[in-house]
C-alpha cells in the first residue's frame, strides 16, 4: 500500500500500531521498520489509542519510531493527559506534530503545526478562523471561536449512536450542499433522525 501511495504521488501515510491483536511495542517498531525498507513515502507516526486494539503508544516508543528515516511527522494524541503533553514536548523539536488530543491553544503554544478536525469536510471556514487566531497568538479568542461551534457540534455528533466517523460527517456535508454518499455497515445511516438533521442545519446556519 505504501508503494502504491508513493507511485500515485502521495507524500505521507499514517503508521500506527496494529489494529486487531494485543500490541507489544517491539512488534510495532519491527513492522514499521520493515515497511520503511520497501518504500520512500513519508511516515506520520500515529498514536491510534481510541479504537481497534486501543494501544496507547508511549512517548519512548514514538521516539524510536521517529528515528526511522521515513518518519517526518507525528499525529499525536493519547488517552493519558501526561503522555499527551510529554509527547508534544518531546516530539515537537524533532518532527512536525499534528495535535490529535485537544488542548488546541496549549498545543499550538508548544509548537504543534495544526490539529485534527472533521469540520473542514463541510465547514472549513471554522477551522481556518481558529488556526488564524492561533497563529496570531490570540489564544483566548481562538478557544472561544472553537468552543462556540465545537460544543454544539460534539453534542450532535454524540447523539448519532452508531459505529464509525463518516456516518456523522456525511449529514453535515449534505446540510452544506455537498455530495456525501452512504455509510458502509456496521455504520447505520438510519440512526441520523430527522431531529438530528434539523439540529445540523440549525448549527450550520448560525
For the regions a protein language model found, what residue spans apply to each?
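Helix-coil boundary/capping segments in enzymes
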Residues: 2, 94-100, 165-168, 174
